Amino acid sequence: QVIGAGCGRTGTASLKAALEILGFPCYHMFEVVKHGHASWWHKAFTVGPADWGEPFDGFRATVDFPAAVAYPELMQRYPKAKVILSTRKSDSWAASVMETIWSPQGKERSWVGAPWNISFQRMGNAFRARFFRDADGGLTSGAIDDSEQLQALFNKWNAEVKAAVDPSRLLIFEVSQGWEPLCAFLGVPVPDVPFPRVNDTTEMKERIRAAHRHYI
């Protein structure tokens, strides 16, 4: 019912928590880790799945990587689903991803480039090949370590989503906006609880370190 097309590190963990409060069990990168879905996503991005709905059994929504980069396929698979483009300022997004999920430092490498888990490395290579493409269709070199290139890719991605999705089906959302625009878009009442704020940069870096400790 809800497809998240926004990049990771745009408040997707908070958005996941909010959607679940509203009654939409939500698939996130956390579920890829929990359910061992990395190999499925690698295959999906390289040869294509039998059914794009397969990993979402029991879920009513999805946000974050890797599913976000498959939003065109998910829109076809779920033609009545609404689309949320979670976003933030491009400079703060680039700073966040360089410190966390695409950190160049070996001890804090992300889920998507994890040298300690070959299935995640393959999945990461496959979905980054979709995201890290220049206007000519080739892979953009060096972008992972360059703030300006990352910002350009982020802005390009957001522009492509806005162009691809009918405005009546799309919510452009920053988690700082809180409940009102999200609930209005989904047609549900505003809950009597604070909007969740989770998974800041410090917390995410600790998640990555914990994953290393678990797998090494």
Label for each model-derived stretch:
Residues T12-K16, H35-G36, A70-E73, D91-S96, ...:
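Short catalytic/ligand-binding loop motif for oxyanion handling, primarily in non-cytosolic enzymes
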Residues A44-L74:
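Conserved nucleotide-sensing/catalytic segment adjacent to the nucleotide-binding pocket
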Residues E20-F24, E31, P72-Q149, V188:
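PAPS-dependent sulfotransferase catalytic domain
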Residues E31-S39, I84-A94, W111, K156-Y215:
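The conserved 3'-phosphoadenosine-5'-phosphosulfate
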Residues G8, F65-V69, S176:
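Short beta->alpha connector loops
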Residues G58, A143-Q151, P167-I172:
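Active-site rim elements
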Residues Q1-F56:
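PAPS-dependent sulfotransferase catalytic core
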